[in-house]
Design a protein with these regions (language model features):
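Helix-centric, low-specificity signal for extended rod-like, repetitive segments
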Residues: 6, 40-41, 51
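Short, solvent-exposed loop/turn elements at beta->coil junctions and helix N-caps
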Residues: 3-4, 45-47
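C-terminal structural segments of small proteins and small subunits
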Residues: 46-69
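Surface-exposed, Lys/Arg-rich phosphate-binding patches that contact polyanionic backbones
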Residues: 21-46
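Short Lys/Arg-rich basic patches
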Residues: 1-17
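Generic hydrophobic/packing signal
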Residues: 11, 25, 50-52
Length: 69
């Protein structure tokens, strides 16, 4: 099951659908960094290049999980 969340990125709204496990890692990372989830997503968005946002978020979450964060 995918969970869809919406964010404002670069002055426009976008929605991203990810599995709950990926959202849990991203939520945890944001909390530990003292940032909002939207701020973390915006940082990933700025660094993703041509990669689709959902893919960039999944890869970021996998890397965070591998680091144990």
């Amino acid at each position: 099951m995918l969970i869809k969340r919406s964010f404002s990125l670069s002055r426009h709204r976008t929605s991203v659908a990810l599995e709950p496990e990926f959202w849990a890692v991203l939520d945890s990372e944001a909390e530990k960094a003292g940032k909002s989830l939207a701020a973390v997503v915006a940082e990933i968005d700025r660094k993703r290049g041509l990669r689709p946002l959902a893919s960039a978020l999944r890869l970021h979450a996998l890397a965070a999980a591998a680091r144990g964060t």
